[in-house]
Regions:
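Acidic/His-rich structured neighborhood in mature extracellular/periplasmic domains
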Residues: 93, 102-298
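Sequence-level detector for tyrosine residue identity
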Residues: 54, 61, 87, 101-103, ...
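Solvent-exposed, acidic/flexible segments
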Residues: 80-83, 87, 230-239, 266-270, ...
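Pan-zinc metallopeptidase signature
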Residues: 303-408
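Alpha-helix initiation/capping motif
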Residues: 58, 76, 193-195, 233, ...
């Protein structure tokens, strides 16, 4: 794919003022409980403070490219994919050490990091910070270029809203659900740097005082403006960047503005964003590989292989059966046992409870979901002439009745 520059620094910065009012498609609802506020008051993530701290970096980097293009000539000649892959390699080293720590903590081991390892991790973190802005620029360029090829925008021949991202670690998310049913009752953004022991402490305190199911989870991205994107694999990073842009785009459409109306519309938004992000990412990957190799597709598990999707779906079904019977303690004991099973099979799930299923269930393509939205939207996408045609069909939805008419 030919990479062309579609970044317009000044335009992006002006648009920021507009989109700031709509930032954050994941709700950060104020708690009615004074007790809960006192528990999490020092851990809350402030979107406004983050914007004020981060925007100047983005502003000066964009201005420097605009005013002093020759200063960045050597960097600009680099392949954007190469820039992103280099960042991913550094990030993978940090994730490797963090995973070792998380696994040891979940298993209850006494994990003490030595000073030498901390120095190594800090070295990688410093490298990430040095490469952050150029990597963001590369991602914005690639995704903008691809969206333009798909002819998706509010205005003709213009990417609107412009793709603008931050690859700083997204905030974590406190998720609350009733114990007697799986329901996304409340979500609150927390700081990204809370430790695993801190998470257990906050969750335990809330569960005992509020009688709720609580979970603090990492998230893949947040549709602020700039959107926050968690860097993982190349395909995943492209997918998440496109996913968050989809939310920014939908802010200007009835579907996006209906996000909080009910759980069904939220699921439609998130699932459509996943379909969009995955298709954009696959297209980029196919171009990069010159169509010489096919993207791996998921196949049904063969016994005696452990199939995460099937096992998680079975877990969700069984938990709901217990809860429908009013047997909360049995459901919670079952989830504890299943969490240990997943951990033994190499899937690092720190905590499996009602809040876990309430959050992951809004993504209908997740094995944690019981929704039919993914199958319905996938069928609609397959019946559409193009990705742009698919988006035009769904962007004006604002209620469940219109959705049902569309997918019939």
């Amino acid at each position: 794919m030919k990479i062309i520059s579609s970044n317009r620094p000044i335009f992006k910065l002006i648009l920021f003022a507009i989109l700031l009012f709509f930032s954050g498609l994941i709700p950060s609802n104020p708690s009615k409980s004074h007790t809960m506020n006192s528990i999490i008051s020092h851990e809350k993530h402030s979107l406004l403070l983050w914007e004020l701290q981060y925007l100047p970096q983005k502003f000066f980097y964009s201005i420097s490219e605009f005013i002093f293009p020759f200063e960045n000539k050597k960097v600009s000649k680099k392949d954007p994919i190469e820039i992103i892959q280099n960042y991913i390699k550094i990030n993978d080293q940090i994730r490797k050490h963090n995973n070792e720590y998380e696994y040891a903590t979940i298993k209850g081991n006494d994990f003490k990091s030595n000073a030498e390892k901390e120095k190594i991790i800090q070295k990688y973190i410093d490298e990430l910070e040095e490469n952050q802005l150029i990597t963001e620029n590369a991602l914005e360029e690639i995704i903008s270029n691809t969206i333009q090829e798909f002819d998706i925008s509010i205005f003709p021949n213009t990417i609107f809203p412009p793709v603008l991202i931050s690859i700083e670690p997204p905030p974590s998310l406190l998720i609350l659900s009733p114990r007697d049913e799986i329901k996304l009752e409340k979500t609150i953004l927390l700081k990204s740097d809370n430790s695993i022991p801190q998470r257990y402490k906050i969750e335990g305190t809330i569960e005992s005082l509020e009688n709720k199911s609580a979970l603090i989870s990492d998230i893949g991205g947040l549709s602020t403006y700039p959107a926050t994107v968690k860097v993982r694999s190349l395909e995943s990073t492209h997918s998440t960047t496109a996913h968050e842009w989809f939310h920014n785009y939908m802010i200007f459409k009835p579907l996006g503005r209906s996000y909080f109306n009910n759980d069904k519309l939220r699921t439609i938004n998130e699932t459509a964003a996943n379909i969009f992000g995955d298709e954009i990412a696959k297209y980029i990957l196919d171009i990069q590989q010159n169509n010489n190799s096919k993207s791996p597709t998921s196949e049904p598990c063969k016994k005696p292989d452990f199939c995460f999707g099937l096992e998680m779906n079975e877990t969700r079904t069984t938990v709901e059966e217990y809860l429908d019977q009013g047997n909360i303690s049995k459901a919670e004991k079952y989830m504890e046992d299943r969490q240990k099973l997943f951990l033994d099979e190499g899937y690092i799930i720190r905590k499996l409870n009602q809040a876990y299923f309430a959050f992951h269930g809004i993504y209908a393509d997740s094995p944690s979901s019981k929704s039919t939205v993914f199958e319905e939207l996938t069928y609609l996408r397959n019946q559409s002439n193009s990705l742009a045609d698919f988006i035009k069909k769904i962007e004006n939805l604002s209620n469940e009745n219109d959705y049902q008419k569309l997918v019939k």
